[in-house]
Amino acid sequence: MKIGGIDEAGRGPAIGPLVVATVVVDEKNIEKLRNIGVKDSKQLTPHERKNLFSQITSIADDYKIVIVSPEEIDNRSGTMNELEVEKFALALNSLQIKPALIYADAADVDANRFASLIERRLNYKAKIIAEHKADAKYPVVSAASILAKVVRDEEIEKLKKQYGDFGSGYPSDPKTKKWLEEYYKKHNSFPPIVRRTWETVRKIEESIKAKKSQLTLDKFFKKP
């Protein structure tokens, strides 16, 4: 039986794409994933993940990567969970070899609902089991998570070469916040790599606009 695993990387950052990856492995090869060191991607260094990438794709019968741009994230019609359902289904439907059973890392607080929503969008029959922290429980999901993280890391490195070092891209990162503030002050807008709908990004924009408006008013009233 063919087993599928699916996960994403980059849901939370204010900068860069969301990457969804799915992997299909024959059930007899699941042990091979464990043997090469596939586990929760968060427990692996970027170098270790990169080394595992080609080994995973060699063991896999099929895999698919979907990259979702910041612009598409900002222009989504629904929630981030709904966008993930849509992109998980897109990745699974794009597979040449269809799995009969799919393990998914649940984005929704209701894991069963998340599974059901994806299952309804499949163009083939498969059973989906969605669980929280599935990437730490199932090697096939760990494998998908590793692929997603490696591709996202590569995308981020490309962006840093073009836009400079913006840190991790997460809103909580002081380096990222400083980069966002400095970029907006200089250009009066954010580049297309930034998720403009993120609260941190909106607050930075509003704060800088308010300060500029105040300076304009101050100059006006200081006129002789």
From Swiss-Prot:
Name listed for the protein in its UniProt record: Ribonuclease HII
Main location: cytoplasm
One GO biological process term: DNA replication, removal of RNA primer
Transmembrane segments: none
Source species: Pyrococcus furiosus (strain ATCC 43587 / DSM 3638 / JCM 8422 / Vc1)
Annotated keywords: Cytoplasm, Endonuclease, Hydrolase, Manganese, Metal-binding, Nuclease
Summary of the function given for this chain in its UniProt record: Endonuclease that specifically degrades the RNA of RNA-DNA hybrids.
Note describing how the cofactor binds: Manganese or magnesium. Binds 1 divalent metal ion per monomer in the absence of substrate. May bind a second metal ion after substrate binding.
